[in-house]
Amino acid sequence: MFRKILFLLFIQCFLAQNISGNIEIKARTAILQDYLSGEILYEKEPDRSIYPASMTKIMTSIIAFDLIKSGDLKLDEKFIISEKAWRLSTAGYSSMFVMVGDEVSVEDLLKGIIVASGNDACIALAEGIAGTEEEFAIMMTSKANEIGMLNTNFTNSSGINDPDNYSTVKDILIMSNYLIRNHPEYYKWFSEIEFTWDRTGGDPITQGNRNPLLYKNMGADGIKTGYLAVEKY
């Protein structure tokens, strides 16, 4: 019988068999954990380096949630959208569709990241918190090291392809556990099916959650998917 919550982090394919059987998967690296007990049920090269793609956004969210928890950031605080953030919304990447000069609340940016996987929202949040995305990436890597992600380095807030933005499925598991244990009140956002943002006060944009597992009636409640041409899903 499946436990209440299981985390499966994988590259390129879904786990094809029941966890109690002999598992054969095509993924180069994978890890499966019973969240409640902490038991690792399956792993395959868990320390192999990968490009985390949009799973990078888990750490982007964690940085913001930690600051909110400490009182150094507020959900209703607004950040002004820079040209750098806007350009990502016009470059074919997953986006929240912000415009230069928009003033967007931290809550909307976070939901734009978590639900719509907006790369533009990531940059806006990073710049609002740290001044530059580069400084924010330093904060991300520092946090990763602090919580035991010893084979991870972040160079950007969105996971856009960069050979120096890397992690492992084991480290992504550590990061995911940290998110759920320390910020349960916000974790529910990861299972929201859609996000609506009305930048003009009359022309709302509604986007569905980028996590396809949420639509499969299999009990998934998150967390994040990622795709890069070099890694696939």
Predicted feature descriptions by range:
Residues 149-150, 161-166, 170-233:
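Domain-terminus/edge residues, biased toward the C-terminal soluble/receptor-binding domains
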Residues 17-173, 177-181:
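Active-site-adjacent loops and short helices of periplasmic peptidoglycan-processing enzymes
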Residues 4-13:
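Sec-dependent N-terminal signal peptides
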Residues 13-15, 43, 228:
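Compositionally biased, intrinsically disordered low-complexity regions enriched in proline and serine
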Residues 7, 21-23, 227-229:
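Sterically constrained small-residue positions within well-ordered secondary structures
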Residues 7, 25, 92, 210-213, ...:
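Hydrophobic alpha-helical context, especially transmembrane and signal-peptide helices
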